[in-house]
Amino acid sequence: MGHRKLSSPRRGSAGLRPRKRSEELLPSPRSYPEVNLPNPVTLGFVGYKVGMTHIFMIDEDRSSSMFGKEIYVPVTVLETPPIYVLALRAYGLNNRGEHSVMGEVWGDLGDFGKFITRRIRGLKIDKEKKEHQLKDIESNLESVSYFRLLVSTQPHLIPALGKKTPDIVEVQIGGGNTKNQLEYGLKLLGNTLSVRDVFKEGQLMDIIGVTKGHGFQGVIKRYGVQELPRWHKHRKGSRKVGTKGPSLGTPSYVPQPGQMGFHRRTEYNKRILKISDDTKLINPKGGFVRYGLVKNTYLLVQGSTIGSIKRPLFLRYPIRPYSAQLPVPKVTYVDVNSKQG
């Protein structure tokens, strides 16, 4: 027989195509959850990945044999300085039935304008035009589907990043009605927003970001294909597939070498174990490897997360949570031993 068997399992997931480099370092969500809250709330935030450590906490799972006892949990540290609210955008349906921007209102940038001009060149805010745009939004409030905030990070507050150019992204407003969302967004214009205003300890969230890049890789590393034996009859190589199929076009499910990593991915239902401003509680001796010391508010997220160190990650309200409400974790110990090895 010329084949090993009648069929073989496909390699890779078609849901992750195309396996190409992400177009942006900080991707914005394609969708947001519907939040049934009486008051408006911002449905996302931005944090920077610091590194990993471990903690001890009380097990809250009643079905676990360790219920009520201390357990070892690996955590990821995300540094989350306040984000600056630049503008408020109103979205509505256009003639083609698609959501588009109906209007936007910019806030006063003040001293923060010198950082924004690094990202948006030639930005000028006309106060008269601002009042006119606000009146247009208020008059067409019934046609507004949702509001989004245009926010900017403040990397100059994080010495470890070594950059001042901010990352700009949109964050949707949820909860309340359209009028309440408009009032909520106008109050935030020109002000900063803390991570405590968005998330709470014990809450679930989704992390959207770009994975660590590995460049151009072969089928062995990219798809986990078994390496062929290295004997005299396999003279055309071992780190490759045995056959790519018929000559008239290769099937799409056949493993091929190409780009590996630096893909846009979403991790669902990551739990926040702790939100704190006490940097002495988390900074290890000698600082985090290839990062340094944490200087701002930070999150401890259960388990590992996507992305490399210093990479911005978008933190979104969970779009499909497995639990409506979880208790606040009881953290008893945080490891601050040196990570230098």
Swiss-Prot record:
Belongs to the universal ribosomal protein uL3 family. It comes from Metallosphaera sedula (strain ATCC 51363 / DSM 5348 / JCM 9185 / NBRC 15509 / TH2). Part of the 50S ribosomal subunit. Forms a cluster with proteins L14 and L24e. InterPro entries: L3_arc_euk, Ribosomal_L3_dom_3_arc_sf, Ribosomal_uL3, Ribosomal_uL3_arc, Ribosomal_uL3_CS, Transl_B-barrel_sf. One of its GO terms (molecular function) is rRNA binding. The gene is rpl3. One of the primary rRNA binding proteins, it binds directly near the 3'-end of the 23S rRNA, where it nucleates assembly of the 50S subunit. One of its GO terms (cellular component) is cytosolic large ribosomal subunit. This is Large ribosomal subunit protein uL3. The keyword Protein biosynthesis does not apply. Residues 1-31, 234-261 are annotated as: Disordered. It holds the Pfam family Ribosomal_L3.
